[in-house]
Every structure is written in C-alpha cells, then in structure tokens.
C-alpha cells in the first residue's frame, strides 16, 4: 500500500531502490496468535531507532512496527534495551520479536526466523573528512570502532588479520562518536 516507501523516504534520502521488492502482497492479513506482542529493539541506530528531543524512541523501525501492528490488529509493547540485549531478550523468551535494522546472516538464520527484508544497506567504513584513510589497507595498525553484535563486527573480525587493524567494540552506536 506504499506505507513502507513513505516511512523509508521520511527518514532517509534513499530512493525506492533501498526498499527491496517483497513477494508478500500488501495488506495480506494473518491471524495474530497473541493479542499483544513484546518487541525488543535497539536504542541508538539512527535513522532506524533513536531518541528524539523529547526522549521518545522514533525512526524507521519504530514507525514500521507500529504500522504492522495496526494493520494486523494486535498490540505491541516496545522495549529498547540496545542491540545485544534485544537479541538476548528474544533468545531468552523475554520478548516475542526484534526490530533493529538487523542484517540477515547465515548464523542468525540458524537462530531466528526473519521477515522479508525491508531495507537494503551495505557495510561501510566511516572516517573523519580530514582523514587520509581511503581503503582497508590504510587501517593497518589503527583501531576501528564497531557496534557490538553487528554484521559489521563480524566482517571486521573476519578481515582483521588480513588488514592488521585492532577492533574496539561499543555497546551502542552513539558511543563510537563521543
């Protein structure tokens, strides 16, 4: 019905090409098993989820899960413990699901059932504008910050010996920039 496109465009400068084509017909209803679901999410991963100036969680994921709940006729309780804790909450049965801009990996598929992807993103390396770092080779001997538990952390760990950098993990994205 175009809701996903509208949400993505509101929060990003991305075109519709960032929104994957799905095989599920829009508006197709399922019968909820429960009247209320506990959904865990990240606490700081803008534009997907972050706190606004009123300390309310907002962003793509927050709008999307609320739209899904409304469309499918169930209530949600959203918790924002952070990415690692959200994953742990679902694994421990403390939450029914997670919405957190999570990359789909083979390891995660072994543990979780995923919806169809709603956004296509790439792993990128960000540096200060004045930096001379232009490639992974330039990271030799440097320390690279990454959010714990992410696909980016997996990528960096898998390539650490190849490029010779150190890895420093952070519990949330905003801490990397402080």
Regions found by a protein language model. Give the residues of each.
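A ligand-binding cleft/hinge motif common to bilobed small-molecule-binding domains
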Residues: 84-88, 100-111, 155-160
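Hydrophobic residues within well-ordered alpha-helices
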Residues: 68, 90-91, 139, 176-178
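Short beta-strand->loop
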Residues: 57, 142-148
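Ligand-binding cleft/hinge of the Venus flytrap
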Residues: 49-52, 65-74, 152-173
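Flexible hinge/capping segments at coil-to-helix
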Residues: 127-144
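Ligand-binding "clamshell"
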Residues: 18, 94, 106-121, 161-164
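Periplasmic-binding protein-like
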Residues: 1-11, 152-156
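Extracytoplasmic small-molecule ligand-binding "clamshell" domains
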Residues: 1, 11, 26, 30-102
């Amino acid at each position: 019905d175009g809701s996903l496109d509208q949400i993505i465009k509101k929060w990003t400068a991305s075109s519709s090409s960032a929104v994957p084509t799905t095989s599920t017909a829009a508006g197709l209803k399922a019968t909820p098993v429960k009247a209320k679901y506990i959904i865990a999410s990240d606490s700081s991963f803008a534009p997907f989820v972050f706190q606004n100036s009123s300390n309310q969680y907002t962003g793509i994921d927050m709008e999307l899960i609320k739209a899904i709940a409304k469309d499918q006729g169930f209530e949600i309780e959203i918790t924002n413990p952070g990415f690692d804790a959200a994953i742990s909450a679902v694994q421990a049965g403390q939450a029914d699901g997670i919405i957190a801009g999570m990359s789909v990996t083979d390891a995660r598929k072994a543990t979780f059932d995923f919806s169809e992807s709603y956004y296509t993103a790439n792993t990128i390396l960000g540096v200060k504008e004045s930096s001379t770092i232009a490639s992974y080779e330039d990271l030799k001997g440097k320390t690279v910050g990454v959010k714990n538990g992410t696909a980016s952390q997996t990528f960096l760990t898998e390539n650490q010996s190849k490029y010779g950098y150190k890895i420093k993990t952070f519990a949330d994205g905003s801490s990397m920039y402080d």
